[in-house]
Regions:
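Interdomain "pre-motor" coupling segment immediately N-terminal to P-loop NTPase/helicase cores
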Residues: 1-16
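Pre-Walker A (pre-P-loop) alpha-helix and adjacent loop at the N terminus of AAA/AAA+ ATPase modules
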Residues: 13-69
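Basic, amphipathic alpha-helical bundle interface domains used for macromolecular binding and assembly
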Residues: 44, 48, 223-382
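Short loop/turn elements that form and flank the Walker-type P-loop nucleotide-binding site
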Residues: 51, 58-60, 71, 125-127, ...
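Walker A/P-loop
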Residues: 55-99
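Canonical AAA+ ATPase core
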Residues: 63, 84, 116-119, 130-143, ...
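C-terminal engagement/docking regions of AAA+ P-loop ATPases
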Residues: 64, 69-79, 303-478
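Short glycine-rich substrate-engagement loop in P-loop NTPases that contacts/grips substrate
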Residues: 97-127
């Protein structure tokens, strides 16, 4: 498998760090995460659950993994953390939080130091950079807010003190609804960048599944040292992280050689990979597709709706005035779309482009990650896309995929016009605002023509913006 990637590297001048990520993916797929996705569900031939989980580890994202119990939600995260971040599985397990109706801050965030009441003893979960929260939806709604800021920004607070945790990936698992769990609140769901689903494996793989052995990803000696570092009282958090990093690099190098996947990542290489991903530019069509998606999240006529409502029959683009193929986002989705959504979409589209050794983020990279950034955040209108998958496990993800297909088709049908619009609205490199407005206003008549020919909110939004800017600019000139 490594030889295959080396040949690809020679043919495509492949990024060496992306090559390592591909090799780690193959290792986990072949040895620790057996799956059988349908071909139509794959991302460029790869299992989406495993691939997105790997990207989460690399970019320090926040991921919610849903599925029935016993489907490998937690163990897959532990294996990825071991290979990417160098934390043995037994150390990760000792630091995990677990959903509990009676959960308290003292269990997983901090406790007072009884020898010095001005001091706190921060819990392992709060300190360890890669975090796993098992069965997150076992917590009552009132308890979920205890972890809101920790998930969002890595800040853990207790008794007027704050621990700013070292950045790392955050994995939470969620079982499908049963008598023991509760609904995760929408603001909490919005904190998760992506969500994936683990499913039952094809029975024909039973022999392989029974032979999976992840003991190589454990190390009792290194795990004990890591836990001792986290439990040490009086040592600065920065020093603890430095000591953890040294142990993690040693463990990661050791298991990578044992598994035959080369040297694996070092901590410095992971930081470099994140910087490379951050600096990948969007191709114009990729950027324009993001703009197109954004234009479908708010109605140009009525603005934003309250949660639980979609733009209805009294709206020009509402549910009563559009067929299924042309029904835009705000008429199909009953949940508000936040700025976090677009940041998550951009981050994972960039990560996918980097992993696939592409130099720019295309519309296809955005399309491929969109369902996984969207489905856990939104509710679809009751009459929208129920269809044959109404009772299937993961129907929300299936609906998000259907929605993605339809919005992508709407974009590609008018791509040439939208690319023209994007070019007209794109700010020049010299940031000359007056020149930018003049260029956009010169395009105003063409936008009006497009708005009449192709009835889509993106043109209505553009006309509104240019009309207001034009009026403001004329007032200033006077």
């Amino acid at each position: 498998m490594i030889l295959k990637h080396i040949k690809n590297a020679e043919a495509k001048d492949e990024n060496k760090l992306a090559l390592k990520a591909n090799t780690i993916y193959d290792c986990i797929r072949d040895r620790f995460f057996i799956s059988s996705p349908r071909e139509e569900d794959t991302i460029d031939g790869r299992d989406p659950t495993l691939l997105i989980s790997l990207l989460t580890a690399i970019i320090n994202g926040k991921q919610l993994t849903a599925g029935n119990f016993g489907r490998g939600k937690t163990t897959s995260a532990e294996a990825i953390i071991a290979l990417v971040h160098g934390i043995p599985c037994d150390a990760t397990m000792a630091c995990e939080a677990r959903g509990d109706p009676e959960i308290t801050k003292e269990e997983y965030i901090a406790i007072p130091d009884l020898t010095n009441m001005n001091n706190l003893l921060w819990r392992r979960f709060a300190q360890m950079p890669p975090k796993v929260f098992d069965e997150f939806n076992r917590m009552p709604s009132a308890k979920q807010s205890l972890f809101l800021d920790g998930i969002d920004r890595g800040n853990f607070e207790y008794m007027n003190q704050t621990l700013r945790a070292e950045p790392g990936p955050f994995y939470a698992t969620m079982n499908w609804p049963d008598r023991g769990n509760v609904e995760i609140l929408p603001p909490m769901l919005d904190r998760f960048d992506v969500s994936v689903i683990t499913s039952a494996i094809n029975p024909m793989y039973h022999k392989i599944m029974e032979e999976v052995d992840r003991s190589i990803l454990e190390d009792g000696v290194i795990a004990a040292k890591m836990l001792a570092i986290l439990d040490a009282n009086g040592e600065s958090y920065q020093k603890k992280i430095a000591e953890l990093t040294e142990l993690a690099d040693a463990f990661r190098a050791s298991i990578s050689m044992q598994l035959g996947i080369g040297e694996g990542f070092t901590s410095k290489e992971l930081a470099t990979a994140r910087e490379e991903i951050k600096n990948i530019e969007y191709a114009d069509t990729g950027d324009n597709f993001k703009l197109f998606i954004r234009s479908e999240t708010i109605c140009p006529t009525h603005g934003e709706y309250m949660p639980g409502k979609a733009c209805g029959g009294d709206c020009h683009w509402g549910s009563g005035n559009a067929n299924e193929e042309s029904r835009v986002g705000f008429a199909a989705i009953t949940s508000p779309i936040s700025e976090r959504f677009f940041k998550s979409l951009s981050a994972y589209a960039k990560a996918l482009a980097w992993y696939l050794n592409e130099k720019e983020v295309s519309k296809d990279h955005v399309r491929l990650v969109l369902p996984y950034v969207l489905w856990h955040r939104v509710q679809f209108a009751g009459d929208f896309m129920a269809g044959e998958n109404k009772y299937r496990v993961g129907k929300q993800l299936e609906n998000a995929k259907d929605f993605t297909k339809k919005i992508f088709n709407r974009f590609t049908e008018q791509e040439e016009r939208i690319n023209e619009l994007g070019e007209a609205l794109r700010e020049p490199e010299d940031k000359n605002r007056k020149e930018h407005l003049a260029k956009a206003r010169a395009f105003f008549a063409k936008i009006q023509k497009y708005a009449n020919e192709y009835d889509h909110p993106i043109f209505a939004h553009a006309l509104q913006m240019l009309g207001k800017q034009g009026s403001a600019n004329e007032s200033t000139d006077k």
